[in-house]
Curated annotation (Swiss-Prot):
GO biological process, one term: protein catabolic process
Lineage: Bacteria, Pseudomonadati, Pseudomonadota, Gammaproteobacteria, Pseudomonadales
Function as written in the Swiss-Prot or TrEMBL entry: Involved in the modulation of the specificity of the ClpAP-mediated ATP-dependent protein degradation.
Gene3D superfamilies: 3.30.1390.10
Family (UniProt): Belongs to the ClpS family.
Subunit structure: Binds to the N-terminal domain of the chaperone ClpA.
Name of the protein described by the UniProt record: ATP-dependent Clp protease adapter protein ClpS
Amino acid sequence: MHAFSKIRLTFNQDDPQSHEDDSAGIAVQDAKPTLQAPPMYKVVLFNDDYTPMDFVVEVLEVFFNLNRELATKVMLAVHTEGRAVCGLFTRDIAETKAMQVNQYARESQHPLLCEIEKDG
């Protein structure tokens, strides 16, 4: 993938003039691509009365690569505040992580709920 592409503009086609560099009236300008950062999405875990705290910590370690200490802090935030952000990702990654967590929770017969929200 090239960082720049070339745009050719032709002037005075009816009256060609000679140029020192033999460009025949063709101007070349670098087109700079305009890139924007993709919108980010929060992956949010919600508290429930049935999912064990150890299971929530396991989910945070496995699916969000948090260490034990940080996973425990996030789990306590879920428990005390009713919800907590597990990570900030692009939409595709956030949707995939939320789906994986929800699927794993169902397979483990826990009602843990994970959703995504647009950041900002």
